[in-house]
Amino acid sequence: DEIDKIKKINKSIVKENGTVESFDKQLIELIGGRYDTRFPMVVSKNSKCLNYITKNASNPILINVSTVIKIKEKHDIGYAFVSDCEQMIKNSIFAFDSLKHDTSKIIVLDEVDDEDNPIIAVVRLDKKMGRDAIQINEITSIYEKERLSNLIEKTYRENKCFYKNKTEHIRSIGFQLPQDVKYALSTEYSRTSFTKSQVEED
């Protein structure tokens, strides 16, 4: 069950009454130097926010402390933004397979940075963790992506899979897409996930 999994991952964030400390609270403890950094942080007890991408909704979502720090120091994305990542993933526009890592998905958030670059989250699915090989989904990065349309185009040409979520918000991130990708991501196209060959067949 959810709580048993969390206990095996990091028992210090499971309270006596069986509830799990919120991700927000974990971040506050990290800032205050009170978080035990040997353990990953638990963003969510389950993966319901990823249900348009994966059927394994029971996997908890984790993020390593080092990742949170890297996101802040390298990408200048603060804790307040990161603390909201579960909600942002839930409201993400669409996602697609990573070209680099078979098990990772690139999630396009409905968010932009100060220079209007889209912000993406990278999630590794079904990672096995620890002695008990607990299946988890891990957020491995969150950053602003310049030239995201180039990556989308390349990924599409490689026949990787795309997953649609709140694609009606696609205009809000305002980048240019090739016509066929634009069509496939639109509400006019009925598939909720697709590859280039499926779009061409249809």
Where are these regions (language model features)?
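Ribonuclease/tRNase effector modules and their secretory precursors
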Residues: D1-D202
